[in-house]
From Swiss-Prot:
UniProt subunit comment: Binds DNA. Interacts with SUMO conjugating enzyme UBC9/UBE2I. Interacts with the telomeric protein TERF2IP.
Compartment(s) where it occurs, according to its Swiss-Prot or TrEMBL record: Nucleus
Name used for this protein in its record: Zinc finger protein OZF
Phylogenetic classification of the source organism: Eukaryota, Metazoa, Chordata, Craniata, Vertebrata
SUPFAM superfamilies: beta-beta-alpha zinc fingers
Main location: nucleus
Source organism superkingdom: Eukaryota
Gene that this polypeptide is encoded by: ZNF146
Cross-link named Glycyl lysine isopeptide (Lys-Gly) (interchain with G-Cter in SUMO), sites: 157, 169
TM stretches of this protein: none
Length: 292
């Protein structure tokens, strides 16, 4: 440490102040690094992929992802990491430590980023917007997966029948058709599900739990997707547009029903007289003619 730096520590002198937040620093170089966070300047670019960073130390860490260099090893399982913070996060899996707790429901997480993503289930916030159709998402990874719909990319293929999907989760759902496996069973009624998330949603029927609340009117829902659709009744958002006539809808299912007007598809047929209908509700209403 230089004599000048020691003098500043002793005297309490910190002459370099951030004009944005007022935070003070003893060195101009430290202030300059701090200011990058405000103006989002990212002068340090990765030569491999072009990704930019605000500080040199971050680009050096990032470059390890390209070289495959993994110097830090977990003592429990032997898994290795190129960055210390990734190792520390990983080790919490073994210790069971979950320091980041949601103030709304008490659910705890290993990483702060996971807590932030979870909190959006309570607020309904979806900051990631698709440039093609305007649909919004709570996580960037969800947006990335959704965008494959527009470019027609379907990298996930079923080994059984060859059907391809744009998102891995849809492939996993589809594969249960072939296996018929339903490992997740409800303790209340015995109903079984192929996915854990489906069981969690189902259990709320018994518990009456509705964790997703509308910030506008206070109405609560058991599923985040139901809240998303409901919020559109306040905002007027209609992200699903018909390519034939331009009419827009707040729900994809409503668009699917509407498209049958153009295609003439009528999948619901009366077993009594053979008359066909485009909507299930119309089919049910018609059947009452035969029962009376």
């Amino acid at each position: 440490m230089s004599h000048l730096s020691q003098q500043r520590i002793c005297s309490g002198e910190n002459p370099f102040a951030c004009k944005v937040c007022g935070k003070i620093f003893s060195h101009k170089s430290t202030l300059t690094e701090h200011e990058h966070f405000h103006n989002r300047e990212k002068p340090f670019e990765c030569n491999e992929c072009g990704k930019a960073f605000s500080q040199k130390q971050y680009v050096i860490k990032h470059q390890n992802t390209h070289t495959g260099e993994k110097l830090l090893e977990c003592n429990e399982c032997g898994k290795s990491f190129s960055q210390k913070e990734n190792l520390l996060t990983h080790q919490k899996i073994h210790t069971g430590e979950k320091p980041f707790e949601c103030k709304d429901c008490g659910k705890a997480f290993i990483q702060k980023s996971n807590l932030i993503r979870h909190q959006r289930t309570h607020t309904g916030e979806k900051p990631f917007i698709c440039k093609e159709c305007g649909k919004t998402f709570s996580g960037k990874s969800n947006l990335t997966e959704h965008e494959k719909i527009h470019i027609g990319e379907k990298p996930f293929k079923c080994n059984e029948c060859g059907t391809a999907f744009g998102q891995k989760k849809y492939l996993i759902k589809h594969q249960n058709i072939h296996t018929g496996e339903k490992p997740y069973e409800c303790n209340e009624c015995g109903k079984a599900f192929s996915q854990r998330t489906s069981l969690i949603v189902h259990v709320r029927i018994h518990s009456g739990d509705k964790p997703y609340e509308c910030n506008v009117c206070g109405k609560a829902f058991s599923q985040s997707s139901s809240l998303t659709v409901h919020v559109r009744s306040h905002t007027g958002e209609k992200p699903y547009g018909c390519n034939e006539c331009g009419k827009a809808f707040s729900q994809f299912s409503t668009l699917a029903l509407h498209l049958r007007i153009h295609t003439g598809k009528k999948p619901y047929q009366c077993s009594e007289c053979g008359k066909a209908f485009s909507q299930k509700s119309h089919h049910i209403r018609h059947q009452k003619i035969h029962t009376h």
